[in-house]
């Protein structure tokens, strides 16, 4: 599922994975550090979000959805200028997560087409789905992007990232500790933006062994 999600990435999207504390300091790079980069280099970077794979038991009424992927993101994951997510997904109905949803850790979610059709029979908005026993209200439904099969890129739920962190993390790519997504201002600036991010990570970790940056 993770691989199918990232197949949709545009070339102006930057994926950051960290593997733990380096030798250059007493802490890891966190999302606040990356927010500072976006503010400092607006000509190269336009947004950043944590990307948390949550370990959550998904249930609607009496049915379990064991292959549904649950990810925690911030409101920046949805790009107002393109009306889509950083990964190219678009909304079929409803809305995406807002700053207030994320800041207040609201129990709301955006679901993919598979759950919308299979669990809710096309009538998902305003309904609730259980994530590890906690009811989440569906505020948005993504447009179909593939074959809408179980376990596919359409079988996904997005929630506020701190909610996902509290659930415990699921299987991330390559055993990473943390993962972030950033967007460059364009394909032409993506390489320079990647270099800016790498330089900031190296400042903290003092070794490229502790992180990976990909476009």
Regions found by a protein language model. Give the residues of each.
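Hydrophobic secondary-structure segments that place a key small or acidic residue at a functional site
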Residues: 51-52, 63-168, 187, 192
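Hydrophobic, regular-secondary-structure patches
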Residues: 1-69, 76-79, 99-100, 117, ...
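Mechanotransmission and gating elements of multispan inner-membrane complexes involved in transport
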Residues: 27-29, 39-44, 130-135, 141-215
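Short aromatic/hydrophobic contact patches that present stacked aromatics
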Residues: 15, 108, 179-181
């Amino acid at each position: 599922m993770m691989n199918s999600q990232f197949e949709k990435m545009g070339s102006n999207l930057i994926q950051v994975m960290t593997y733990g504390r380096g030798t250059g300091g007493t802490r890891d790079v966190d999302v606040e550090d990356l927010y500072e980069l976006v503010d400092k280099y607006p000509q190269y970077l336009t947004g950043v979000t944590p990307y948390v794979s949550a370990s959550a038991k998904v249930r609607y009424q009496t049915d379990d959805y064991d292959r549904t992927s649950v990810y925690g993101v911030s409101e920046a994951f949805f790009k107002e200028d393109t009306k889509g997510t950083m990964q190219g997904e678009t909304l079929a109905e409803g809305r995406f997560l807002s700053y207030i949803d994320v800041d207040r850790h609201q129990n709301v979610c955006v679901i993919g087409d598979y759950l919308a059709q299979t669990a809710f029979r096309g009538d998902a908005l305003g309904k609730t789905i259980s994530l590890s026993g906690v009811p989440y209200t569906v505020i948005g439904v993504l447009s179909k992007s593939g074959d809408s099969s179980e376990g596919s890129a359409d079988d996904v739920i997005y929630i506020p990232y701190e909610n996902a962190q509290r659930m415990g993390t699921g299987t991330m790519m390559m055993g990473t500790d943390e993962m972030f997504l950033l967007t460059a201002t364009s394909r032409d600036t993506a390489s320079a933006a990647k270099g800016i991010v790498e330089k900031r990570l190296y400042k903290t970790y003092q070794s490229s062994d502790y992180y990976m940056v990909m476009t």
